[in-house]
Each structure stands twice: as C-alpha cells, then as structure tokens.
C-alpha cells in the first residue's frame, strides 16, 4: 500500500520501505501472463511463470488459481513463492493471518497436486530472535502440512530461514544438543523421511548464503548435505527485479565456497538439474490438465 500519511511522496516498492499494510495484488497474475504471451516462443521456453496473486488465508484462493489457468492456458507452471509465516511481513498483511493449519491452504495444495503445479512455499521455520535449545516453533506444523499433501510437488523456500530467522543451533551441553538438533540435522531428517519424498528445498537468497558460508564448519556441513542429496536442492538468487546480470552473479558468487566442495554431478543438479527436473515435469502436467479441463 502506498499510504501518503506514512511515506508521503515516496512510493514504496518493497515491504520494508513502509509501515502501511500489505495486501495481495491479484492483477499481478494477469500482468505476468500478458507479458509472457508477448514473448517469442524461444523466450517463453526459458521461463516458468508462477501464480502469486492469491491470499492463502482465503478459501477462494484455490478458485483464483483455477481461474488464472482457465483464463491464461499455456502460461503458468506453478504457484509461489507465497508466504505463510515470514518475519516483518506476516504481521503487516491486512485481513486474516495466514496459518499452516488453515483449510484454505490445504485447498490450495490439494488443487496444485491435482493440476501438477509445482509449489514454492515460504514459511519461516521459527520466530525471529528465537532462543537456542528449543524446537523451531513452526517445524511440526510445517511437516504435518507437507505430509497431508503427498501428491503435490512442494519446494520449501530458503530451507525455512530468513533475515533474522537463523539456523537452529543447540546450546552447549549434550542433553540440550540431543533435544535440539541443528538446522542441517533437521533438513537431513526430513530428507530421509519417506513421507516427505515430494518435498525439495531451495537455497535462494543472499540472506541464506550468509549462513551457509559463515564459517568453515558451516561450509563443510552444508556441502556434505548437498553432495548427499543433490536431487532435493535448488539454487536461486531470489533477487527482486535485478537491473543487470552482475546483480544476479553477486548472489551466485557468494556460494563459491560451497560450489568448490561439491562433486561435478552434485553441483550441476543443485545449480540447474533439480530445477529442470521439477519444473519441466510440472510444465507438462499443467499443460495436460489444461487440455483436459479448459474449454
């Protein structure tokens, strides 16, 4: 919202630039679709537009997604990134608060599974400034949600991290450490869980990179995890409307200490292969659904 009483003549373009409420701008889906349709086929083939203009706390959200597909067949591959719990954002959204237990979210994920849409979901694993030694507040609810939708391809954005939602670290002492695994152990447990085989993780955002390369030990832990499960991770920059390629490469280069420790096969899968596999499959599934359902 551009609230003149809050920011005056300054027009905010990012959620941190204003204290005014945020709202879901549904026209974004039509705007993206029209822009995509103006591209040449060779350009379209390089893009996977995503539906984002829905309120995940609204029981009509799944209907909105269906209408977008019916109105613009041949365009969209998935939904997201959309947000449930996010530091500095959730409290600013006008209307009902989104929740991992809201049936509106279940309707969204159920419909995505029916169509074959890939889902990118941002949900902080914990509250900001959480105390060490405690289980992340939203971890159990998140896993329960993921298990309720085994037919839906879901990507947990940023592995649940944020600007101040940092990786879980156990307190000193074996007893506490045993009760509270660190972030890498949480991810590994989820990766080994057969009920979560449909879930992948993206390592996009420079805020995630700062945790990944924060120390030699952190670099070693994450690179070992990526080498062991390269089919479950996707790299991305998470840049918002970058002006040039250098802006994109700045985030990519932050990961150089990690890239240096990956096997060639794992490196390619994390940087490109996992994305191609998930999104190419989703694109084919969505097009098939549109042929069968859009009249």
Where are the regions that the model predicts?
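Solvent-exposed loop/turn segments at secondary-structure junctions
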Residues: 54-58, 84-87, 125-128, 160-163, ...
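Divalent metal-coordination and catalytic microenvironments
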Residues: 79, 112, 158, 201, ...
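Structured loop/turn residues at beta-strand edges in well-structured enzyme cores
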Residues: 74-77, 194, 231, 265
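Structural helix-adjacent loops and short alpha-helical linkers that scaffold large soluble proteins
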Residues: 44, 151, 195, 260-269
């Amino acid at each position: 919202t551009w609230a003149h009483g809050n920011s005056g003549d300054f027009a905010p373009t990012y959620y941190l630039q204003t204290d005014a409420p945020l709202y879901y701008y549904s026209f974004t889906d039509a705007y993206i679709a029209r822009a995509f349709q103006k591209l040449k086929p060779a350009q379209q083939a390089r893009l996977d537009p995503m539906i984002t203009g829905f309120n995940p706390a609204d029981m009509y959200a799944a209907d909105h997604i269906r209408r977008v597909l019916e109105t613009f067949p041949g365009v969209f591959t998935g939904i997201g990134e959309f947000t449930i719990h996010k530091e500095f954002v959730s409290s600013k959204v006008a209307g009902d608060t989104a929740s991992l237990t809201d049936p509106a979210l279940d309707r969204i994920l159920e419909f995505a599974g029916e169509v074959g849409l890939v889902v990118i979901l941002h949900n902080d694993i914990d509250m900001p400034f959480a105390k060490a030694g405690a289980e992340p507040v939203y971890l159990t609810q998140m896993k329960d949600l993921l298990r309720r939708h085994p037919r839906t391809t879901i990507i947990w954005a940023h592995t649940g991290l944020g600007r101040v939602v940092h990786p879980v670290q156990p307190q000193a002492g074996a007893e506490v450490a045993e009760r509270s695994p660190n972030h890498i152990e949480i991810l590994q447990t989820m990766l080994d869980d057969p009920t979560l085989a449909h879930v992948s993780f993206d390592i996009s955002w420079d805020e995630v990179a700062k945790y990944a390369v924060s120390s030699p030990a952190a670099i070693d832990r994450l690179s070992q995890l990526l080498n062991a499960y390269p089919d479950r991770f996707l790299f991305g920059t998470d840049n918002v409307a970058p002006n040039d390629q250098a802006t994109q490469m700045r985030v990519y280069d932050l990961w150089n200490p990690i890239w240096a420790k990956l096997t060639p096969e794992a490196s390619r899968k994390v940087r490109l292969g996992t994305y191609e596999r998930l999104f190419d499959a989703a694109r084919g599934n969505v097009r098939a659904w549109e042929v069968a359902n859009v009249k």
